[in-house]
């Protein structure tokens, strides 16, 4: 039975990852950590939780020594658009936190996961069916952090034998937590606005294709990768992942199947648009499929139904 410590547990991915891991491995076997306490009624209250600033190595050591995990899932990070507003802080948090977590994994012989991103690619990367191994010259601080992180994970595996594993996540779409500073967040916000207001003003331009995936598929991919036979993992430092390549008009049309009067217009944010323009339109996920069986279950249509149903349910519950 795995015993897992998760950093950044209150983030978009972390929240749902903690819930899934506790379901699989037991509430008491998953330590959730973040820089602040979870809200009252949070799903994270059903198991151990500790305050952790990932830039504080001594505190991280203390928690590992007391909880004695065999696995670290390092999810704490500043996202792409937020990182551009404060690049020095982004470097300190994203790289300092990762170095601390990797050192802990080395010192205590932990299996290690941290996510990379399609943000690790840049304008000179092939934009269509982007290969697993290709040019990576990102133009955002977040992307620079992710490329450095991929290389560090490979270094710690080759130099110290740390069982590091990672994936390049596309935009992740979830109804559990609302958007939090990412370039792909329009594809989450659009569903909430469709239910609440019947219209949405997109900060990403029409015909801007980006890879996306439903959060349930993303969480299952993490678990599947961490359970996979390490001998078969050739590209362990960061597997390309995606379930769909979409642009705002496609999401609008999917929503209009359920909300025929839904309206979409555009108020493009130049910062986030420039980041999106530097990313691929679609990526090749064949290595993840071949090496550990990646198989996402949700396409745009199936995801849209789940998103709208879940948000409608939340809205009705809040009215009561």
UniProtKB/Swiss-Prot annotation:
Belongs to the NAD(P)-dependent epimerase/dehydratase family. Signal peptide: none annotated. Coiled coil: none annotated. One of its GO terms (biological process) is threonine catabolic process. The lineage of its organism: Bacteria, Bacillati, Bacillota, Bacilli, Bacillales. It comes from Staphylococcus saprophyticus subsp. saprophyticus (strain ATCC 15305 / DSM 20229 / NCIMB 8711 / NCTC 7292 / S-41). This is Uncharacterized epimerase/dehydratase SSP2164. One of its GO terms (molecular function) is L-threonine 3-dehydrogenase activity.
């Amino acid at each position: 039975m795995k015993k897992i410590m998760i950093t950044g547990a209150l983030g978009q991915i972390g929240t749902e990852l903690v819930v899934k891991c506790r379901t699989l491995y037991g509430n008491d076997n998953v330590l959730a950590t973040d820089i602040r306490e979870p809200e009252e009624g949070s799903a994270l209250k059903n198991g151990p939780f500790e305050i952790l600033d990932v830039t504080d190595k001594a505190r991280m050591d203390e928690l590992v020594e007391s909880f004695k995990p065999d696995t670290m899932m390092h999810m704490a990070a500043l996202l792409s658009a937020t990182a551009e507003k404060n690049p020095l802080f982004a470097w300190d948090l994203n790289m300092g936190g990762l170095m601390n977590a990797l050192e802990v994994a080395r010192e205590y012989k932990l299996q290690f996961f941290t996510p990379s991103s399609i943000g690790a690619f840049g304008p000179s990367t092939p934009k269509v069916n982007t290969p697993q191994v290709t040019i990576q010259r990102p133009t955002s601080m977040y992307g620079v952090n992710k490329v450095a992180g991929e290389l560090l994970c490979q270094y710690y595996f080759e130099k110290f034998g740390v069982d590091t594993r990672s994936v390049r996540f596309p935009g992740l779409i979830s109804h559990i937590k609302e958007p939090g500073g990412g370039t792909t967040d329009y594809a989450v916000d659009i569903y909430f606005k469709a239910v609440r207001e019947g219209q949405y003003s997109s900060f990403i331009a029409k015909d801007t294709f980006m890879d996306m995936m439903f959060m349930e598929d993303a969480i299952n991919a993490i678990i599947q990768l961490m359970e996979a036979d390490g001998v078969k993992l050739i590209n362990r430092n960061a597997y390309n992942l995606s379930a769909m390549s979409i642009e705002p008009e496609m999401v609008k049309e999917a929503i209009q199947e359920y909300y025929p009067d839904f309206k979409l217009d555009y108020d493009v944010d130049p910062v986030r648009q420039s980041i999106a323009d530097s990313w691929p339109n679609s990526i090749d996920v064949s290595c993840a499929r071949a090496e550990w069986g990646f198989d996402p279950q949700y396409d745009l249509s199936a995801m849209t139904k789940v998103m709208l149903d879940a948000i409608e349910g939340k809205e009705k519950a809040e009215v009561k």
